[in-house]
Curated annotation (Swiss-Prot):
It is a multi-pass membrane protein. GO terms for biological process: apoptotic process; autophagy; cellular response to unfolded protein; negative regulation of apoptotic signaling pathway. It comes from Sus scrofa. This is Bax inhibitor 1. The keyword Endoplasmic reticulum applies. The intra-membrane loop at the C-terminus acts as a calcium pore, mediating calcium leak from the ER into the cytosol.
Amino acid sequence: MNIFDRKINFDALLKFSHITPSTQQHLKKVYASFALCMFVAAAGAYVHVVTRFIQAGLLSALGSLGLMIWLMATPHSHETEQKRLGLLAGFAFLTGVGLGPALDLCIAINPSILPTAFMGTAMIFTCFTLSALYARRRSYLFLGGILMSAMSLMVLSSLGNLFFGSIWLFQANLYVGLVVMCGFVLFDTQLIIEKAENGDKDYIWHCVDLFSDFVTLFRKLMMILAMNEKDKKKEKK
């Protein structure tokens, strides 16, 4: 029998038997909200880079933080669902605006960095998400303590680098941060599943976790590509 004549059963590939139907429905809502966030964040980035109508700065950062706190403080219920979706969209929009300065920098160095960084982030995020979904339940939850410790060390090294000004430490922080965020995609995805299995159906807040992971991954990969491109240009001179 020719192996090329075999039919691929895509239904079997997308079947997560270890996840209950109610949690699968919850995940659909989470990723639908995530798609909404991506679209709105792209609009926010467009507003900063192209129209300049709203500029990234202290006000946009405080606005993003304020909307996230407001969203967190608003209880999840059917009555507050539309309000919280509006807060989520506002948070995503201002997050996109906040990416503006990094986008401007990359465009100045080489505009092709942006699609490369986005496609790379999308591939990384998708691969690690599928790994978490197909893996045995709770198999990646042990990463929580390790990831938080790594984040603490990264924050301390970043603060220390304000005084030392080491480019090597800055680059190391970017690469380590990229690896840590990949771990957070695994951890957060499985944590969302466990929360849903235990009755926490707040898909809007769960979306915030994944959206924040994606944006941080994108920012770090974008900066790594920008630095590499800048180094290449220096070598050519």
